[in-house]
């Protein structure tokens, strides 16, 4: 099986190089991660990156995800993403290219500052099909995934795994103050099982 990883808003960096190598080794998959801001030179300043999200195009990001999946050279490909990358996982549910999808704390509705003519609403894409392929990993204290929106996810057929004491970004970066080791281990284990399920 293959796996495409959509990084968080900070994009490709050693954290994701290491994650690709680790999951390829431990999960016995062919794994690739892609840069969400290709052909742009951005600093690590989150305000700068937040301002650039509205300039992204859903169609271009989906094209990049498809090309990454094709580059893996396997028929069955899963998708996993974090934060903004998790939001794009929700948007990718409209595609039949990904057999299973796991979104880690992906936005359910497009944040106001990210709205543009090229940015569709994640929940609308999920309503369009294949929501049953999506596992949403959610921290109950995450302001980007409030309880009323989580209910909307459930309402369109997404499988939700909530972690009651977790905030945004609790699983993929051990350097973050929000990191919760036990919850992260559980979330990755559930994601592996989800991706491998037929």
Feature annotation, model-predicted:
Residues 1-74, 122, 170-172:
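Serine-hydrolase catalytic machinery in alpha/beta-hydrolase-like enzymes
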Residues 79-81, 104, 137:
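Short beta-strand immediately N-terminal to the catalytic nucleophile in serine-hydrolase-like folds
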Residues 81-85, 89:
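Gly/Ala-rich beta-loop-alpha elbow adjacent to hydrolase catalytic centers
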Residues 97-112:
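A conserved short beta-strand
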Residues 116-133, 189, 193-195:
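Conserved serine/cysteine hydrolase catalytic core
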Residues 129-130, 136-138, 142, 163:
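Short beta-strand/loop motif that positions the catalytic acidic residue
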Residues 143-149:
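Conserved alpha/beta-hydrolase "acid-adjacent" motif
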Residues 157-198:
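C-terminal catalytic histidine-bearing segment of alpha/beta-hydrolase fold enzymes
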């Amino acid at each position: 099986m293959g796996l495409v990883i959509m990084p968080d808003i900070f994009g490709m960096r050693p954290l994701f190089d290491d994650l690709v190598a680790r999951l390829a080794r431990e999960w016995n998959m062919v794994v690739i991660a892609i840069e969400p801001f290709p052909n742009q030179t951005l600093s690590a300043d989150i305000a700068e990156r937040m301002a650039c999200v509205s300039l992204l195009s859903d169609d271009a990001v989906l094209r990049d995800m498809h090309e990454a999946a094709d580059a893996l050279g396997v028929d069955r490909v899963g998708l996993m993403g974090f934060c903004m990358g998790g939001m794009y996982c929700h948007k990718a549910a409209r595609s039949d290219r990904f057999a299973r999808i796991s979104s880690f704390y992906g936005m359910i509705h497009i944040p106001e500052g990210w709205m543009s003519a090229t940015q569709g609403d994640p929940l609308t894409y999920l309503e369009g099909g294949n929501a049953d392929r999506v596992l949403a990993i959610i921290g109950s204290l995450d302001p980007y995934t409030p309880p009323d929106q989580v209910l909307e996810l459930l309402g369109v057929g997404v499988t939700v795994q909530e972690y009651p004491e977790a905030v945004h970004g609790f699983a993929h970066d051990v350097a973050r103050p929000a990191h919760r080791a036990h919850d992260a281990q559980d979330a990755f284990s559930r994601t592996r099982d989800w991706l491998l399920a037929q």
